[in-house]
Amino acid sequence: MKPTHARYWVVVLALALAMIMYIQRVAISQAIVPIAIDLHLNKEQTGLVLGAFGLSYALFEIPMGLLGDKLGVRWVLSQLVLIWSLFTALTGAAWNLASMWVVRFLFGAGEAGCFPNLTRMLSAWLPLSERVRAQAVMWAFGRWGGALAPPVAFFVIYHFGWRLGFVALAMLGVAWVAFFLPWFRNDPAEHKSVNAAELEMLESSRKLVLHATAVDLRALAI
């Protein structure tokens, strides 16, 4: 029996989300000029707005990853994408420096959990021989999302304005969750599209990793 290829759909989901998160992340760089004009922000205040994301991302990346370990990727990642998409939309509702800073800070807190949870998802769904390649492609798609963000954001802002533009960009995350949540399972064994051969491939790889880890620990104990 040949293995099924359900795991490749997991990779596609990871690649799509990596691209979406970078589009939503970088879009503010294209909107910052009209934002600064409408909210009467000077250069220092604009810097505070742009820096809010980086601060929260650094603070929450590890906790959000641990949350995925404890509660499972399916639920945690779905909630995180909805949370950061909500704050993407709420970017368009900000009315002053404080509100914009809070919104961007909370947006960063949501996005901070993306790559830790995607990494866990790929480790559960891919054999060891495919993980490094999938991780590399996922990071590349993220950067392509960053490259696509300027023209996409410019198009959206030009046609809808920056406020409605962020609402439109938020819909990308909502659409992703609408497909991911009903389809994905934390354990490949629980997925109806995974046959016995594909499951055996994944289980064998998992046992190999556990064996190698045990050998390393015994070596350290000597």
Each predicted region: which residue ranges?
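Helix-loop-helix hairpin linking two adjacent transmembrane segments in secondary transporters
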Residues: 138, 142-184, 188-191
